[in-house]
C-alpha cells in the first residue's frame, strides 16, 4: 500500500471504536486461545522472549500482561550518562526545538504548546531547547523508564485522535503527536524541567503511570490536570515511570539551559535500547 493510501485509511477507520474493542479483547483471559494469540504475535513480529522475565507465553493470562511484560534483571544496564534512553524503539526524530516548533517529518512540525495541551507558559520553558521522539514498534518492550532522575510536578491527560504513529503516518499526518491522545508528564530534574509525553495511537488500549495507574480509559473528552507539588514523588534514573498497553511513541522535551548534546550515534530511524546513552551536557 502506498503512503498516501495508508494515510487515507487512517482518516477513514473508526479508530475510537476499534481501539475500545481491541482494548477489551487485550484484557480478556481466554486460556489456550490467549496463549495461541500471544504465540502468533511473537512469531509475526519476532519478539525476543529470551529477554523477558518470564519467557513462557502460557504464563501470561491476558494479551496485555504479555505486552507489558517485564525484562530479566540486568538485560538493560544503564550507561554512565546524564540522560539515558527511556525505552526500546527507533528514533523518529531528534534535534533542536526551533522557537517552540518541533520537527515531525519533512514538511511537518508542531508547537510545544499544542503538544502539552495548550499551556503556553509550560511550553515556553522549552523554547529553543531540544526534543527526542522515539517510536515503539509492536515487538518492543513497552515500559517507559526515566532518562534522568526527577521529581514529578504535574500530569496532564490530553484527549485527541487515535491515528497510528508508525513512520508512514508521521510523514503524512500533520501535527500527529500534538493531535493524538496523550499523557504529558512534567518533572523537575538536576538539569532543569523535563517533559515526557506518552502518545496514544490506534489500538493502544490504555496508558498508565507508576504513580497513578491506568490513566485512560476512561476517556472523558476533556483535558485533565493533576498537580503533585504537595507530594514527593521522586523517580531515579532508569526507574520505570509508565507503560503502554499496546505500543506507541514517547516525546521528550528539554530546556535550552540543560546544555544537552545528543549521542552522536543517535540518528533518524536508528534503533535504540533502554539504558543506552542518550545525551550528555555539552558533550560531542
From Swiss-Prot:
Heterodimer of a large membrane-associated beta subunit and a small pyruvoyl-containing alpha subunit. This is Phosphatidylserine decarboxylase proenzyme. The lineage of its organism: Bacteria, Pseudomonadati, Pseudomonadota, Betaproteobacteria, Burkholderiales. It catalyses: a 1,2-diacyl-sn-glycero-3-phospho-L-serine + H(+) = a 1,2-diacyl-sn-glycero-3-phosphoethanolamine + CO2. Its EC number is 4.1.1.65. It is found in: Cell membrane. The record marks 247-248 as: Cleavage (non-hydrolytic). It is an enzyme of class 4 (lyase). GO terms for biological process: phosphatidylethanolamine biosynthetic process. Pfam families: PS_Dcarbxylase. Keywords: Cell membrane, Decarboxylase, Lipid biosynthesis, Lipid metabolism, Lyase, Membrane, Phospholipid biosynthesis, Phospholipid metabolism, Pyruvate, Zymogen. Belongs to the phosphatidylserine decarboxylase family. PSD-B subfamily. Prokaryotic type I sub-subfamily. It is a peripheral membrane protein. Pathway: Phospholipid metabolism; phosphatidylethanolamine biosynthesis; phosphatidylethanolamine from CDP-diacylglycerol: step 2/2. Is synthesized initially as an inactive proenzyme. Formation of the active enzyme involves a self-maturation process in which the active site pyruvoyl group is generated from an internal serine residue via an autocatalytic post-translational modification. Two non-identical subunits are generated from the proenzyme in this reaction, and the pyruvate is formed at the N-terminus of the alpha chain, which is derived from the carboxyl end of the proenzyme.
Amino acid at each position: 500500500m502506498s503512503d498516501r493510501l495508508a494515510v487515507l485509511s487512517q482518516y477513514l477507520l473508526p479508530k475510537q471504536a476499534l481501539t475500545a474493542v481491541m482494548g477489551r479483547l487485550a484484557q480478556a483471559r481466554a486460556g489456550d486461545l490467549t496463549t495461541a494469540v500471544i504465540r502468533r504475535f511473537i512469531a509475526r513480529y519476532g519478539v525476543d522472549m529470551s529477554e523477558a522475565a518470564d519467557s513462557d507465553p502460557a504464563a501470561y493470562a491476558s494479551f496485555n500482561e504479555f505486552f507489558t511484560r517485564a525484562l530479566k534483571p540486568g538485560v538493560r544496564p544503564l550507561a554512565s550518562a546524564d540522560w539515558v534512553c527511556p525505552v526500546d524503539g527507533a528514533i523518529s526524530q531528534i534535534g533542536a526545538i526551533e522557537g517552540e516548533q518541533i520537527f515531525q517529518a519533512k514538511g511537518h512540525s508542531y508547537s510545544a504548546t499544542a503538544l502539552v495541551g495548550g499551556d503556553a507558559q509550560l511550553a515556553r520553558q522549552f523554547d529553543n531547547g531540544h526534543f527526542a521522539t522515539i517510536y515503539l514498534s509492536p515487538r518492543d518492550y513497552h515500559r517507559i523508564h526515566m532518562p534522568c532522575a526527577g521529581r514529578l510536578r504535574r500530569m496532564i491527560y490530553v484527549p485527541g485522535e487515535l491515528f497510528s504513529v508508525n513512520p508512514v503516518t508521521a510523514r503524512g499526518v500533520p501535527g500527529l503527536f500534538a493531535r493524538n491522545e496523550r499523557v504529558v508528564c512534567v518533572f523537575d530534574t538536576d538539569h532543569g524541567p523535563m517533559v515526557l509525553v506518552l502518545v496514544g495511537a490506534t489500538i493502544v488500549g490504555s496508558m498508565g503511570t507508576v504513580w497513578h495507574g491506568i490513566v485512560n480509559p476512561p476517556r472523558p473528552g476533556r483535558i485533565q490536570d493533576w498537580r503533585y507539588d504537595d507530594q514527593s514523588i521522586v523517580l531515579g534514573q532508569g526507574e520505570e515511570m509508565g507503560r503502554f498497553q499496546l505500543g506507541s511513541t514517547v516525546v521528550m522535551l528539554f530546556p535550552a539551559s540543560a546544555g544537552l548534546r545528543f549521542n552522536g550515534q543517535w540518528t533518524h530511524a536508528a534503533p535504540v535500547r533502554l539504558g543506552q546513552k542518550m545525551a550528555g551536557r555539552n558533550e560531542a
